[in-house]
Each structure stands twice: as C-alpha cells, then as structure tokens.
Amino acid sequence: MSRKPIIAGNWKMNKNPQEARAFVEAVASKLPSTDLVDVAVAAPAVDLVTTIEAAKDSVLKVAAQNCYFENTGAFTGETSPKVLAEMGADYVVIGHSERRDYFHETDEDINKKAKAIFANGLTPIVCCGESLETYEAGKAVEFVGAQVSAALAGLSAEQVASLVLAYEPIWAIGTGKSATQDDAQNMCKAVRDVVAADFGQEVADKVRVQYGGSVKPENVKDYMACPDVDGALVGGASLEAGSFLALLDFLN
C-alpha cells in the first residue's frame, strides 16, 4: 500500500526563537501539498511557542524533541505532553540515541512516553538504532528489533499504525557517514517486520518508517526510492531553509 512520506527536521539544540521564526517564514509558503508529503520540524523546547505560532497558517507541522510521561507534577526541568498538546504541537520525537546515550533513557521510559503522547492526542516519532559495534558484529536487526518491540509494548494496533518509526544508525548521526541504500532498506524492512510480528501485517503496512543519519539533499532521493523507507529524520541539513527545502526535491 502507498504510505504518505514524512520528512522531519530535527534542529537539536540549535536556533533561538528569532531564528526559528525566520526559518519557518522562509519555508512555509514553499512547501508541497500535504496530499504529497507531511513535513515537520522538531524544535527545542525554548522555541516551540514561536515555531508553532509561525507555522500555524501553513502545512508545516511542529514536533517537540522530547517530553515526560506524566502530565503534571514535581518533575523539574521536564516537558508535559499535555501542555505540548495545548500549545498546538503535532508530534513528539522520543527515544533519540542522544537521549538514550547522554540522559540514560531506557526502552521502558520510551514506552511510557509513547503512551503519554497518545493519551494527549499527539503522535510519537519513535527512534531506534544501533551502535557501530553492534552493526559490525552483525547484530543490528536483533538489537533494533528489541528496541522497537519494547517501545511499542502495550500500544493498540490503531496507535501503532498511526505513529512514525525512525531508524537512525548511531554510527551515521552527524558523522558524515551514511548507511548505504541497501542498509537503509534492509533495516527499515526489519523494523516493519517487527511491527508485523507484534501487531500484524496490516498494521505493519500502514506504519511509516523513516531513515535518519547524515541525510542530505544529495542522497535523500536514493533513500526515498527504497520500498520500506517512508521518510527521513534529518539533523544538520534541516538547519538551513534552503537545504531543508531541497530535501523535498525527491518528489520531482
């Protein structure tokens, strides 16, 4: 079945509110129809209000880069999924390797966040991916499969069909190394196969799987030609309006 592509930029800890607004103003009027592709940017928490406000009359969707799994409480420094929904966010990125690595987030944390995100009417973009050691040991499929199963445990089939999975090999994030087209296809298919095993083929056929890891305007078309790659989660190339728009040239 045909799945609508989704291109999402992850700004990470970059841009102040003025820069975020300028970016949205530069790209908003130039984006293709939502019939063709969903386009989103994941802004830092400090930029979300500005980014959502600037994007509100356009087709650009806005993601948060993280949230907590409780709506309110004594959780200093955390972001409420309930408030993200009230602000007008569309997506929340969870399970990014930087969160797992630097902030010691576990599969259980990510699963709780996925449930909280759905409970508040938002859509999770659930990241998964292996280290270079795991890849070179030939254990990538097994490792990433376990991440996906754990992250989605206890969700309904309907919820899983509607979310986004982002496969990002850790060795390709910000390193300039990128997975080959075959690597990307094989791993995104492996991710989809886990969904099929856990939730059935119909759900697996609906869920969108992105590839991430040094995706650039020069290579996005190759990745998007893969039958099991439904989009891209893009870091560095999403920081400039020109290169972000150029990522959408794969449609032509």
From Swiss-Prot:
**Binding-site list for substrate:** N10, W11, K12, G174, S214, G235, G236
Q: Which SUPFAM superfamilies match?
A: Triosephosphate isomerase (TIM) (SSF51351)
Positions in coiled-coil regions? none
By sequence similarity, the record places it as follows:
Belongs to the triosephosphate isomerase family.
Q: Tell me, which GO biological process terms does this entry list?
A: gluconeogenesis; glyceraldehyde-3-phosphate biosynthetic process; glycerol catabolic process; glycolytic process
Q: Which UniProt keywords apply?
A: Cytoplasm, Gluconeogenesis, Glycolysis, Isomerase
A GO term for molecular function: triose-phosphate isomerase activity
Tell me where in or outside the cell this protein is found.
Answer: Cytoplasm
Question: Known NCBIfam families for this protein?
Answer: tim
List the catalysed reactions: D-glyceraldehyde 3-phosphate = dihydroxyacetone phosphate
GO cellular component terms attached to this protein's record: cytosol
Provide the protein name: Triosephosphate isomerase
Q: Which cysteines are joined by disulfide bonds?
A: none
